[in-house]
Amino acid sequence: GKLLAVDPHRIRSYSKRRMRERVEKGGSRPVKMAQTFWVLDADTHQPVCFTTATTARSVVDVTPELMDLAESILQPAPGQALVVADSEHFSGELIEDIHQRTGFDLLVPIPNRPVHRKSYRQIPEDQFTRRWAGFATAKVPYTMKRGGKYFQFVERTGERLDDFRYQGFLSTTDRDEVDALTSDFPKRWHVEEFFNANQSMGWRRGGTQNLNIRYAQMTTALIAQAAIHQLRAHLEEPFSDWDASHLAKDLFFRIDGDVRVSGDTIVVTYYNAPNAERLRSRYEKLPEKLLKESVQPEVPWLYNYKLDFRFR
């Protein structure tokens, strides 16, 4: 939990409820959207928490609640965790709130507007440090009108004055800007990889805006995602690289098996699972293995039956 990525993920909603419509892509017509907001561990590529909201609520409205949830889970010490976000989170009110009230540091791109591009060109040349061919960085103080005093990291690409291109980032703390810009921030794209690989399990579309139903449906999908993530770790290529749809179609739907009850244990037997030896070493005699890890093997939502597997 030392590097986190926060990102909104909006999906088409088919709710009958009257709600504000939203244009998600340029050139498309407004449609009903269900909003979800996520925090992912950018190193493990796995979700920490999420929340959902109607299109009436903005990123500025929802993100403080989301970060409170992440803080209650991770309980980071000040300066221990860095949150990377997109330019939609560039708000003085939001940045100040997270900086002052939580233990998270924040790194946010500054929107590519003319006023900002002009300010980058006015930075003296001696404040830029050439890192390698075509890449230089500068670290300068930055004050927001509705926020506090922070740091602005500016990256400059190009070798000649006519070719210079700039991109600015706001950091709530003084840190190494090269690591932040070339190592930390690019990991934010793991959020998109997570959505692309797993959204078929429950967050590709929304059929209702009832919050109880939405939270239950998405939470159940995340339980499935966590189980499949562990399964991928025990499958060799190409299975380990397949997205959720591919796994469902060409792995799960093609496995034969049966389910039996033996005493207080539900036994699931698979007959043609790939990498059976690796799966057998991990999942057979599962109740005994859980007890060795001080985990109770009874499953509450299976009427406290234990769950075990066999591979033939």
Task: Go through the PLM ranges and name each one.
Residues 2-11, 45, 80-90, 106, ...:
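Short, conserved catalytic/metal-binding motifs centered on acidic residues
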Residues 12-14, 57-58, 89-93, 114-117, ...:
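Flexible loop/turn segments at secondary-structure boundaries
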Residues 26-75:
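Electropositive, glycine- and tryptophan-enriched low-complexity nucleic-acid-binding patches
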